[in-house]
Amino acid sequence: MKKTNKRPDGRKFQKGGKPFRSDKGEGRGRMNNKKKGSVNAGLDRKVLVEPHPRFPGVYISRGKEDLLLTRNLVPGVSVYGEKRVAVDLEGMKVEYRVWNAYRSKLAAGIVCGAENIHMEPGSKVLYLGASSGTTVSHVSDIVGKDGVVYAVEFSERSGRDLINMSMKRPNIVPIIEDARYPSRYRMLVPIVDCIFSDVSQPDQTRIVALNAQYFLKEGGGVDVSIKANCVNSAVPAETVFADEVNILRKNSIRPKEQVTLEPFEKDHAMIIGRFKLSASEEKRQSSQKKD
């Protein structure tokens, strides 16, 4: 299993190590040089937007700052006050949303060097621990109109925000339920391509494994964001991560990568793997990487 604790290409997504700025909840203050609640969706000819080299549906803007982006599924609408960038693409205005790694564990995993998040246009994703939908909205952008995000959130308060957001995004299915009991929403979720989990519970790895048994296709992707202190605050973070990896292995999930999420999140790691990957399939994938 590959462990990563630095960005793969050495490029910075924030000059001077400064975070992207946003104006709500989990964010780190206001947007740079913008009043609270403002966005910038004007046509910017100085910004070059290019596809991310590893992740279909994810983009990078090259300008004064390098920013992680997703193409807005609902142009003209922001979800949580995020900055929007519009560029001219062959005579057509295309709008992108800035994806802040300080507000999204999945974005942090990408910036910190993950090689595969198992999501792309057309994917079906089961998202556990959806909260109010900040990261869910970007996954919605990634999978696009042909994909679906099944977003599970237990909190009724966050669930209301999630439902309101999903009204404008038809590819999100909000599920206000406890992820520890997947049988309660088994009639709503089909077989999916990937499970992403950001559930802050001591048994979060077991929760992921249980949902995988219900909903994840054979060979499907598993992305687990782990906060060490939520699992066991009495031992070092690396010990916690190693224990969680072993739990995944015992539940037919083969870890492939472990990515630390610092400096975006302290004592966090993302473990990325495959579910019930057969020996022949693993050999085929290994040979493809060598080629």
UniProtKB/Swiss-Prot annotation:
S-adenosyl-L-methionine binds at residues 134-135, 153-154, 178-179, 198-201. Residues 1-12, 20-29 have a biased composition (Basic and acidic residues). Signal peptide: none annotated. Disulfide bonds: none annotated. The modification Asymmetric dimethylarginine is found at residues 28, 62. It comes from the Eukaryota. GO terms for cellular component: box C/D methylation guide snoRNP complex; nucleolus; small-subunit processome. SUPFAM superfamilies: S-adenosyl-L-methionine-dependent methyltransferases (SSF53335). Its EC number is 2.1.1.-. One of its GO terms (biological process) is box C/D sno(s)RNA 3'-end processing. It catalyses: L-glutaminyl-[histone H2A] + S-adenosyl-L-methionine = N(5)-methyl-L-glutaminyl-[histone H2A] + S-adenosyl-L-homocysteine + H(+). It is an enzyme of class 2 (transferase). Keywords: Methylation, Methyltransferase, Nucleus, Ribonucleoprotein, RNA-binding, rRNA processing, S-adenosyl-L-methionine, Transferase. Pfam families: Fibrillarin. GO terms for molecular function: histone H2AQ104 methyltransferase activity; RNA binding; rRNA methyltransferase activity. It is found in: Nucleus, Nucleolus. Component of box C/D small nucleolar ribonucleoprotein (snoRNP) particles. S-adenosyl-L-methionine-dependent methyltransferase that has the ability to methylate both RNAs and proteins. Involved in pre-rRNA processing. Utilizes the methyl donor S-adenosyl-L-methionine to catalyze the site-specific 2'-hydroxyl methylation of ribose moieties in pre-ribosomal RNA. Site specificity is provided by a guide RNA that base pairs with the substrate. Methylation occurs at a characteristic distance from the sequence involved in base pairing with the guide RNA. This is rRNA 2'-O-methyltransferase fibrillarin.
